[in-house]
Amino acid sequence: LMYLLVYFSTALVIACTGTMLMGALAWAGLFTYSIILAAMLQISGHLFFDTWYEGSYGILAAVRDLGSPLMVIVSFMDKYSSGNYGKQLLILIFVLLLMAVLSWMAFCRRKSENTGKALVYTWMEPVLSALITIPSGLGIGLIFYMIPEDSSKTAWWIFGMILGTILVHGVLEVIYEMDFRRFFRRKVQLMIFGGVVAICALTMKIDLLGYDRYFPAYDNLQGVVVNVCNLSYTEQLCNVEKKENGIYKIRYTATSDNSSGLLDQPVMKSKALYNSLKDIRLQNEKGKKSGRRMYVRYINKQGFSVCRSYSVSSAQAQNLMEALYDEQTWKEDRYSFFQLDKQYLKEVTGIFCDGDIHSLFEKNAEKRQALAEALRKDILENGGQTVKDQPCAMLMFDYAGIPSEGYMDEWGMNVPAVQEGERVSTSVLVYPAYKRTLAILEETGYPLSMDELSVEYIDVYYFSSEAAGEDDEAFSDTEPLSDLEETENGYKVRYDKKEQLEALKKCIRPSQLVNGWTIWNADVTMEVVLEGQESTGGDSGLYMTFAGEIPDFIRADAKAAHVTCLLYTSPS
């Protein structure tokens, strides 16, 4: 079937063209046009729309996957490898029959007196010119738009569009007539195409269609799907679905550039979630864009889907995560790996407030299973208020020998099953509200709060900003509250007073035990030295990060050390 599709596509090109040059160009265009057009639309959306979703869906997916025989073949091969190719097979057969009919009609109606022309059917000339000139003008303009980094981008963009439109249109006219003197043969047509290019460019530049302003009314909304993989990256999870025959279907959390991250997750609808998304959209519209990206699929009552991508601040992410943790279906899907039979759970490890990794209940399988079950119940029974607190531990569950039909990796690619069964590794944060889980973890004796650590001193390393000089007005009259010891990359301060240690213990955590949506500072590193230990001199050891309100003495020393990015954004 694939061979026949290529054959009839080639026959169609031969029947419609009269020269080798035009035939070769038309054949290449038939097989690659939709790919290039889809890529150009993606780049345009990324450059001009703040809420552009880079995944492939809807019209864009249809253009890319169905717009050329090559992509029809590629899509069929991709689905064939996963065993779910019925729909793609029907599309392949339909396109094959379409190409066969068109090539037969083109051959039968081909006039012998036109065989020496570039195109046998002259009515194709303006159609091909429009299909090639307009996207080419926009595409060449994009290339010029991306080159400069200053305010001249718009001027270069306009120049590139004018140049591209004139050049491509003229080259096509030369190819049609095989005469360089025909470069400006159709001036009116060129002006019309130039006007269309200008309208398309203006539409993108000032968002005439309201792409970034889109937000559905609550009453017209069937539900939303939210992908927060960039916000809660601390946890490593996968979706598990048990089939009737005992075989599992496994899907890892999809990344931002694959539409499966919004297709296979639960549909939700609640006022709290809606209001949280509305606030995020309004802040993006006002230009207040900071933090990480999140992805949303809105489904209206007619069944149509619209996807968007938003920048989310720490406070907005906190409100969003609270709303999501109130959604039972979302939690059941997010933590569905707990559906795996207990026999496949081989190991449980944990990270506690001392920052170390400990293996738990190595010789007690029943205890490991009880711990997993306790955590599952705690997650499902506790709501959004749970994630207002910082985690006190992280548990990692390792499963092996799982009978599976294969799995979908984080890039949305299908990986075939292996005979010995799949391995699944997950990590889940434990919050203070998870009473059942904490009761079991207390038996281990590992610290579940910073208060349980006996800290001798804390070395804080301040990495000075390169932009801040000794004469910078922002730092000129700042006096440190502590002794700054100069290091290769900045300064170090040792805090060993009781009140300092108590204040720091309230606002620091091992980096693994910080909510993924909490913003902390990368210009400060803290090495915590417990009683009886020795400092490693900053090369390795127990490192912490800010996860609470930063004390005034830290802020003062950071400013004196020329640290310009001392930041913790409170989610409250």
Give residue spans per PLM region.
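Conserved small/polar residues in nucleotide/adenosyl-binding loops
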Residues: Y568-S572
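Internal/C-terminal transmembrane anchor helices
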Residues: I132-S136, I175-Y211
